[in-house]
Amino acid sequence: MQHGRITRGFYFEDLPLGTTWLSQGRTLTESDLGTYVNLTWFTEDLFTDQHNRTGNAIGGRPVPALMVMAFSEGLVLHSMDRTGLAFLNVDMDVKSPIYVGDTIYVHCEVIESRATSKPGRGLVRTRNTVTNQHGETVLVYQPLRLYKSREGKTDATSTS
């Protein structure tokens, strides 16, 4: 099953294995970087000193991978609107540097979906592939979330 733009949160039953969707894009700005670095005290020279970044042979103004993941989560938030119950776990793999000025998109695919022993909820793991404006994969993360089921029913038709 493939979904376009998301206008409401998915219920557990909406997310069988193989379901995919794509987020809108988000351009990462200098202001975003400054706000994130100051808010989190992520004061590494690589992110705070534009002119004296030691050992920076990558070019461009890099953005912390955790900031990219946080912004990516914001982009997929609509898929959990009023149906997401908990963020339980995540595995993350940074594939490429991300820079100020890059636009990110999140491609989501359900890779695990199973009912829980408690009625009214189910566990869903997605593979979230973050790409830049050139279609290059920059980050892949696999969050495990707890979703509501419709009308409190649990249907164990999906498996991992």
Provide a role label for each language-model segment.
Residues 1-17, 98-160:
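HotDog/MaoC-like acyl-thioester-processing domains
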Residues 1-89, 150-160:
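Hot-dog-fold acyl-thioester-processing enzymes
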Residues 45-47, 86-87, 92-93, 123-124, ...:
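Short, intrinsically disordered/low-complexity patches at protein termini
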Residues 81-100, 106:
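Mid-chain, well-packed structural core segment of small domains
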